[in-house]
């Protein structure tokens, strides 16, 4: 959220509230067959797109993710090589948007240059609480209502 300063210098929240959205870029390894020049063009297009969003105050710098990784799952804490052992698709990078609506986040995602190469962009609102915490809060509120 942006802040404005009033005449006394106190920070006041601007009228336009922003929500943060996480963009997850999913892709397979389509790029391995491209020439160096083709790769450089795609990289430049993506950097320009992200740079514009950051300059407009709509995004924060994201992170690129390595292909390698591990997955730990279940009660037995099974460890599998790779972030998505059952899939050839991987999350290649992330970007956090700070925009007013999901519709604006979708419009921004639709402009991602990587989509021309069959990448997928998943858009998720960033929440102040995880689903487990939200469920516990809702159940506590329901119990308080019943016991009131």
Task: Please give the residue ranges for each predicted region.
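Conserved, structured core segments of small domains
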Residues: 2-148
